[in-house]
Amino acid sequence: MRLYWTPIAMGHLRAAYEYVARENAAAAETLVEQIFAVVERLEQYPRMGRVEGTRELVIAGTAFVVVYRVEAERVEVLAVLHAARKWPEEF
């Protein structure tokens, strides 16, 4: 199954990187690498997660959650959210 990042999700990831990089650029790089590494697992195991219509993937060791949905031929990454943030209305 292919993995597709929506522009919104990439914007969330970019914002998380920029926020962390203000204090520690190396930590920001590590965070993004860790998120990508975990999300790549969705290609083989797309049914991880728990919300009907969407699923959530907690990035261990961070405060981030990746929201995604499984389509016929791809896994669509919808958002990268900090766990302390208010959950968006569309989810």
What positions do the PLM features span?
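Short hydrophobic/aromatic beta-strand or adjacent loop that forms the aromatic wall/cage
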Residues: T54, A63-V65
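Enriched for short, Lys/Arg-rich terminal
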Residues: V65, R69-F91
